[in-house]
Amino acid sequence: VWNFVNSLVEFNRYTNSPVANYKGEMYNMPFNMNTFSRMWGISTPEEAKKIINEQRKVIKGEPKNLEEQAISLVGTHIYQKLVKGYTEKQWGRDCKELPAFIIKRLPVRYTYDNNYFNDLYQGIPIGGYNKITEKLFEGCEIRLGTDYLADKAKYDALADKVVYTGTIDSYFDYCFGKLQYRSLRFETEVLDCDNYQGNAVINYTDRETPY
């Protein structure tokens, strides 16, 4: 896959290493020894594990919701500062109302590694994702303003296989009712400075910051 996409466009060497901002306190993500050292003033994995193991004792049995699942993974301090507010802003729900599986794969590392992904290859297309999209669609017929669900038979006849990327409940004609969805609103702001926040990705994890 890496060779294929590089045959279309050139990639830079961007590596995703997010930072969390909790009321002006800065923490590395994913949760790793840099996070734990900043949170508790410690330096070894043994110290971090001891604190987390002590804090997770408040959870008895199998976690029943996202809050319990998060605490069972990273303890109460990190949950309160870096998980709870950010997650509730994302989902528009209290963490106690969200299922545990949402956060079961929360990465926790006992090394000083700020790399969010473990993938061998990482990068962003130079010139943006539009460049690679244009290359992928070269020679393809593109029709805009179409509604697949309005005439399924017509569009099904155009190809041996159809990949539908719309809402799954509408695809099945809402046979089980409408699903609840959360979406994103992107806002662009151009600032007259060389470097505004010091990192490509910063998560504002307190509940009061509206993003």
Where are these regions (language model features)?
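Short, solvent-exposed secondary-structure boundary motifs
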Residues: 8-11, 95-98, 125, 132, ...
